Amino acid sequence: LRHPHHDKSPRQPLGRNIITSLWGNCTIKVLVGFLFLYPAFVAKSHDAGAWEQLKILGLIGAAAGIGNFAGNIASARLKLGHPAQVVVRATVIVTAAAIAAAVAGNLMVAAAAALITSAATAISKASLDASLQHDLPEASRASAFGRSESVLQLAWVVGGAVGVLIYTDLWVGFTAVSALLIPGLAQTLVSYNGGSLIPGFGGNRPVLAEQEGPRPDPAAMPGAR
């Protein structure tokens, strides 16, 4: 007789560091998605000439490119001994930049927010990857990396949807996206301290989950040198 195959391997729990890093990265990705689409709608909505539209898109695009380049260099050189803490700080800075852009409502501050956000998302993603690499056994990492990418893409889509649907005044757009970032930041901070604003989503977790396999040597982690 054939017996049905049952996968008896327990599901690998996620520790507080990974949960915090996921919440922070998702919060930042919302603003990344927003900034990818919103400036184009702002440029097209105003009765400006082609050069003025090019100025808006070029300034924000250049700022985002410079920020991404700087963030990748910084993440390669940083010692990610406390990746969750790095993500928390990046989320605070990004949320503050979005609020500043909402208050100022001008192009230069929006470009500065794009630069900060692009740098922060590169550093935060490297920190999340370091948490997954260090906190999970090898058998669970591939699945965890795949699921985290799916969650981050969903957060990006949410931010992009806000950029498409919201009114095309800079202060209105950044106010709307800040209204999403602030709860995300709050959840990130609460998760870092071991709680959760949403029952069942990150609360009451150990800093490091109990692993079902050997934990890799921190010295071998990317950025540890």
Spans of features found by a protein language model:
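Helix-loop junctions at membrane interfaces in 12-TM secondary transporters
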Residues: 102-114
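Juxtamembrane intracellular "pre-TM" segments in multi-pass secondary transporters
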Residues: 1-30, 204-217, 221
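Structural signature of the two symmetry-related core transmembrane helices
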Residues: 85-100, 178
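Transmembrane alpha-helix termini and helix-breaking/packing motifs in multi-pass membrane transporters
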Residues: 44, 157-181
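Multi-pass alpha-helical transporter architecture, strongest
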Residues: 176-213, 217, 224
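Helix-to-coil boundary motifs at intracellular loop junctions of multi-pass secondary transporters
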Residues: 42-50, 81-82, 102, 131-136
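Substrate-agnostic recognition of the 12-TM MFS/MFS-like secondary transporter fold
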Residues: 20, 24, 28-32, 64-76, ...
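A single, central transmembrane helix in multi-pass transporters
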Residues: 9-69
